[in-house]
Amino acid sequence: SSSAASDVYKRQPYAFTARPWELNKTESIDVMDAVGSNIRVDARGAQVMRVLPRLNEDINEEWISDKTRYAIDGLRRQRLDRPFIRGRDGKLAPASWDDAFGAIAAKMKKAKPQAIAAITGDQCDAEAMFALKTLFDKIGSASIDCRQDGAKIGGARAGYLFNSTIAGIDEADALLIIGSNPRVEAAVLNARIRRNWLATRLPVGVVGPEMDLTYEAVQLGDDVATLTAILDGSSK
C-alpha cells in the first residue's frame, strides 16, 4: 500500500533531511567490500547524506549492497571523532590530540623497537598507512601489518586477484567457491550468482565451512585434501 511504502521511506537515513539540489555529488568507489562497486556520494557541506549506485555493467551494474547504502550512519553516530586515553581506573576518557600523542610517545620511548608493532585498520587511507610506515622506519621496527585475522597472503598477484571477471559469472556454467561466503562478504557478487542460478540452475560447489547461501550449493569439504582431490580428479 502507499502508506506502507511511505513508512518504509521515512525510515531511510536520507528521508526528509535535504533537497537534491543542495547536495554536492562525488563519484567514488565503495570500500565496504572487495567488489569495488561504483557509487556516488552525496554530501551537504561536510556531512555525507546518502550513497547511490553508479552504473558499471562489468562490476555492480546498477546495484549496491545494503551495507554500502546505509554504512553512512556509522559516520554520523558511531564514529570515534576524538582521542581517548585509558586512565588508572581502566576506563577510557576523552583527551586532546596533544595529550594522546604525548601518551603514545611516552609508551614508545620506554619500549625497545623490536617490541613495538602496529596493525592498520580495514578502512585506513593510503596516506595514513604511509605515515605509520615512515614512523616505524624511523624507530627501527619492521613489525607493521594489515592482516587483522592473521591470514597468509602471498605477494603474487594471482594470490589476491579474482580468477574470473565479475561479469563473467553471468556466463559461467559451473562455480567453485573456496573459503568464502559471498552472501556476507560480497552481496552484489552474490546477487549475480543467484541470478545465474535462478536462470540456469548453475552448479555451485563449496570448499569451506557450511553456510546459508541464497542458492543451492554442494558442500564438497572444508580442507586442503578436498582441493587436492578436485585437482587430481579423484573428488566425487
Give short role names for the model-derived ranges.
Residues 183-198:
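Amphipathic helical hotspot of TIR/SEFIR-family domains
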Residues 17-18, 37-38, 48-49, 58-59, ...:
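Flexible loop/turn segments at secondary-structure boundaries
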Residues 42-114, 163, 170-174, 194-236:
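Cofactor-/ligand-binding subdomain signature composed of acidic, glycine-rich
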Residues 2, 169-170:
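A short, aliphatic-rich alpha-helical micro-motif
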Residues 114-169, 209:
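Anionic-ligand anchoring segments at beta-strand to alpha-helix junctions in alpha/beta enzyme folds, i.e.
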Residues 1-5, 9:
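Single conserved hydrophobic/aromatic residue that forms the stacking wall/gate
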Residues 20-22, 29:
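N-terminal cationic and glycine-rich segments that engage phosphates or anionic surfaces
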